[in-house]
């Protein structure tokens, strides 16, 4: 019963303890927060990007494991390097997707350009490499979801095995947007409205199409455009 007693004590203290919240303008590391106490960091404005493979379950069920491993490795490597090149902070890998947080004055523009570059990497780098190596009709599809909001983060887990959890609309909506297949890039209207014009228009043509997200009751924007890496 020692474990049960310890857990009851810890859970009780977590629900009754007072939160210490510190404002920050940058993405913290897990070590910046205390693990076993109600300690959080508050980003007043941050933009979250999720890049996710679409159809990976079918791929694993029908393709050789080596093929699937190469798809995972190349997609996540390209997405991660592009995220970092655009100033994003990688905060988590979850199976076939990567999460990143962008801060600063150009966070929405940087995140959107990142998404278009990931699309370019898929179309112009990964897909040609697939065709060169494998005789297959497989088409790599992905979705990048982006939202912006206030975010809080807290440290979760146990000593020696812990990470950060992100609490806020952007973290949830960006992840959920990747569940909407059909378009490689999806952003909320809050992100679109804060984009620099160079990320909205190409030769006077809007690169984004409005689409209502019925489940959440908000407007989003989709794009099939790419931005050369």
From Swiss-Prot:
InterPro entries, per database record: A/G_cyclase, Nucleotide_cyclase
Domain annotation Guanylate cyclase: ranges: 47-178
Binding site for Mn(2+) 2: 52, 96
Superkingdom to which the source organism belongs: Bacteria
Main location: cytoplasm
Enzyme superclass (EC): lyase
Binding residue positions for a ribonucleoside 5'-triphosphate: 50, 97
UniProt: Mn(2+) 1 binding residues: 52, 96
Cell location: Cytoplasm
Cofactor, how bound (note): Slightly more active with Mn(2+) than with Mg(2+).
Cysteine disulfide partners in this protein: none
pH profile: Optimum pH is 7.0-9.5.
Entry EC number(s): 4.6.1.26
Cofactor(s) it depends on: Mn(2+)
Gene3D superfamilies per UniProt: Nucleotide cyclase
Any one of the GO CC terms: cytoplasm
GO BP terms: cyclic nucleotide biosynthetic process; defense response to virus; intracellular signal transduction
Catalytic activities: UTP = 3',5'-cyclic UMP + diphosphate
Keyword annotations from UniProtKB, A to Z: Antiviral defense, Cytoplasm, Lyase, Manganese, Metal-binding, Nucleotide-binding
GO MF assignments: adenylate cyclase activity; metal ion binding; nucleotide binding
Outcome recorded upon mutating residue 52 to A: No cUMP production
Assembly notes: Homodimer.
Biological function: Pycsar (pyrimidine cyclase system for antiphage resistance) provides immunity against bacteriophage. The pyrimidine cyclase (PycC) synthesizes cyclic nucleotides in response to infection; these serve as specific second messenger signals. The signals activate the adjacent effector, leading to bacterial cell death and abortive phage infection. A clade B Pycsar system.
Family per similarity comment: Belongs to the adenylyl cyclase class-4/guanylyl cyclase family. Pyrimidine cyclase subfamily.
Name of the protein in question: Uridylate cyclase
The organism of origin for this protein: Burkholderia cepacia
